[in-house]
């Protein structure tokens, strides 16, 4: 009985960390949609999620780098992405997503629209913000 109780406690403790890792609301604000257009500066195609960075110019010519979190690589492939072909450093993109709660230039990506008009999903839906 004691072994069973220990095993159940260990399993439950593991599920808490998994749930915390996948808590959109803990890191992002579904009430604050954002759309930015800029040039892809870097792509980190890795598990558990990809990250891509977009340099966005303001009206005065200053550049701010936005960090976007996307789906895991295997989910992006199912959405039509190809690791070295879909999005490349230097591409101009428009990204829609939801702002991070803490970092004002970080967001959870939802959709990426490319210069040729092609639009691909890059992350889950969240919040009430529409596009």
Residue ranges and their predicted role:
Residues 62-74:
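Short, basic/aromatic beta-hairpin or loop at an interaction surface
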Residues 36-40:
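Conserved hydrophobic positions within beta-strands
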Residues 19-34:
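Short boundary/loop segments of OB/S1/cold-shock single-stranded nucleic-acid-binding domains
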Residues 78-95:
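Short nucleic-acid-contacting surface segments enriched for D/E, G, S/T with interspersed K/R
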Residues 128-131:
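Glycine- and charge-enriched low-complexity intrinsically disordered segments
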Residues 46-57:
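Short aromatic-glycine-enriched beta-strand elements
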Residues 5-17:
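Bacterial N-terminal signal peptides
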Residues 100-124:
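OB-fold/S1-family single-stranded nucleic acid-binding modules
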């Amino acid at each position: 009985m004691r072994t069973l109780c220990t095993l159940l406690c260990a399993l439950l403790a593991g599920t808490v960390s998994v749930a915390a890792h996948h808590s959109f609301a803990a890191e992002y604000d579904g009430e604050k949609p954002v759309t930015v257009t800029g040039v892809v500066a870097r792509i980190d195609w890795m598990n558990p999620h990809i990250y891509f960075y977009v340099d966005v110019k303001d009206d005065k010519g200053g550049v701010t780098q936005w960090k976007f979190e996307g789906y895991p690589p295997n989910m992006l492939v199912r959405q039509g992405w190809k690791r070295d072909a879909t999005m490349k450093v230097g591409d101009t993109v428009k990204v829609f997503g939801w702002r991070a709660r803490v970092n004002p230039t970080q967001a959870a990506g939802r959709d990426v629209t490319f210069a040729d008009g092609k639009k691909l999903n890059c992350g889950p839906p969240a919040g009430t913000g529409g596009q």
